[in-house]
């Protein structure tokens, strides 16, 4: 399953990307598109899904952990929360269409350390997805790079995002 995430308010040509992915993926593959709060993208994708049985559009969900666990590959924006979740779950990723600033720095970091492939267009994204899905070695290297982040750091970042707090290290006696 290819999990496509458009960010909470959408990003770029998600419908075009999803439809082109469906045409290029093996017939036993399917695409789940998380539209977040973007009702326009959700409605448009739902219209297509009536005729395309391998397309599953989803609105806002608080169960991203389940989608990440089921995904063979994630395609999405390099937002801070998404990047953290991808690294925590160890899912191969293609990060695209970054917003200048924080997202572009996330993209640079994840691509520099081999934790994701970065793309700037639908065409590049389709090519990157094809390369990743056809190479188990490439996916494994990416997941290994994601796991190389110290887990204490990932846990602290996750706690900060979810709870607004960071656990303090235990005092040494």
Residue ranges of predicted features:
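Donor-nucleotide binding loops and adjacent catalytic segments primarily
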Residues: 1-70
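Acidic donor-binding loop of glycosyltransferase active sites
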Residues: 69-79
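Acidic, glycine-centered active-site loop in nucleotide-sugar glycosyltransferases
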Residues: 89-91, 105-115
